[in-house]
Design a protein with these regions (language model features):
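Cytosolic covalent-transfer regions centered on His/Cys nucleophiles
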Residues: 1-156
Length: 156
């Protein structure tokens, strides 16, 4: 993981107040917040919805249920990592299409533009959520600054 990827974690990209009934509503809310900040192209919303439909990103890890939606860099204006801790869990289809729906308590939207960066980040995130203490620390965060600090410490 490059230091540049860790620098994509910013308090302005951490959301605790997003309410959504499903992944599509979550993407609408993210677009409303990220587009004015200059992170997304007009194609992002349709692209992330289509990618999620074809390649679901819900993960039922031993310590938490999460989702890691992302899309191709061509749909981004600039790189980012957005973190959403929704008011109530959001249902995502399971990665690989096998198993029950995932009730994601945390959604990490990757907007990485570096070649191979998304795969590397997915591996790092899996390491966090396979570890009970790290996962508990991340899930216990209640401020954007705390969330950035927790993730930054594990991803560096």
């Amino acid at each position: 993981m490059s230091q540049a990827d860790v620098e994509l974690l910013r308090p302005e990209l951490v959301f605790f107040d997003l309410e959504a009934n499903d992944a599509q509503e979550l993407f609408d809310g993210l677009e409303d917040r990220l587009k004015p900040l200059g992170y997304l192209k007009d194609t992002w919303r349709a692209a992330i919805g289509e990618r999620e439909k074809n390649y679901p990103t819900g993960l039922a890890c031993p310590t938490a249920q999460i989702a890691i939606p992302h899309t191709d860099p061509v749909n981004l204006e600039r790189p980012y990592i957005a973190i959403v801790k929704p008011k109530s869990p959001i249902k995502f289809q399971p990665m690989g299409g096998m198993g029950d729906e995932v009730e994601a308590k945390l959604v990490i939207n990757l907007g990485i533009m570096r070649d191979g960066g998304q795969v590397e980040m997915l591996q790092k995130l899996m390491g966090i959520f396979m570890d009970e203490a790290k996962s508990a620390n991340v899930l216990s965060q209640t401020t954007p600054e705390g969330m950035v600090s927790a993730f930054g410490g594990y991803l560096a």
